[in-house]
Amino acid sequence: MKKSIIALVIAGLPLAASAEVILYGQIKSSVTVGQVKIKGDAGSETSSTATSINDNTSRIGFKGSENLGGDLKTIWQVEQKTDITGGSQGFANRDSFIGLQGKFGKVRAGKLSNMLNEMDTIDPWMYKTNAAGLGIFTRTGNRNAAVRYDSPDFGGFKFNVSYAPRDNRNPSDKYTHTKAAKDQYTGGVSFSKNGFTANAAYGHYNGAYTDNSGKVKAAQIAKVETYYDKDNLFVGGGVHYAKGHETANKYLSYFTDGFNKYKGIDITDDIADPVKSEAVKVVDAAVTVGYKLGNVTPRITYAHGWPAKGVNSGEKLVDKFDQVVVGGQYTFSKRTGINAQLAYLKVGNKTRLTAANKGGVEQKAASVGLYHKF
């Protein structure tokens, strides 16, 4: 404990020595109550009502810059999760980088989000279970050891590209290259003017799945998000396509929140149901509307997902889903507020639960959380 305190004091010394170093972060926690129900040909399985205290992406970071002359400067950032429920976290496990910025834009290297990971503006909710927010819509973005270029602003238009190298993605294979490459390419464009913003991104994730001929193929992800945020009104929507990003079993697990047993069989297990170990292609869409009334901002989100079909077989493995989240935010100040929501999510009854049963999944959730940003 004493060593930890000393380390924090030493780490804080540069903050007093340089005005270019900024300490920032947020603390967010919520209480969630939820229940999952699996209904199939052989009857229903209903979970107990679960109540949990959650950390909701609490973080702390340091960032700064140094003017190198002219318009050129060094930029850097070190950011990490700080799980206030006591979960073990590392250092620099969020966006952390060093780079250069100038009239040409900026180039960074480190642990970086691709643009897909940044397209979550229409998801304002605090949640742990996917029923209570747009966890399905935001699932394909990631953060990797990568290099990224962001263009300057051309009258509201910007673009970016990022690359996560093979040997960072496959570190155990970096000197032999006997395994399929898993490097990732991502690119995106955005336009913003007078409160309106439109974002579009494409991700090409190598080494994601195997086709019928045994060839290893890349996951292909495309996403569009647009929103209007001005004069107290927020209206936003998005469409998301993912091919080969996950298996049917993995995709189904997003809806069960860990309650996976139906008649004693794990409905998300590849061994229990190898048919659903096939990669799937999925399309989902979402829309969020909110309006600020003084300190209160009521919101509603609706999401719909079309059936997930096998990339090789074309078979419907997970049925369509529909989701509604209703709630809002109350702000005590610019930095502190409360979020609360009620949510309902339903996966259609044509989902392959097991080899012998089809059915669907329902999930209900309620959550209330407090946040503070600094």
Identify the function of each model-found stretch:
Residues 1-374:
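Outer-membrane beta-barrel proteins
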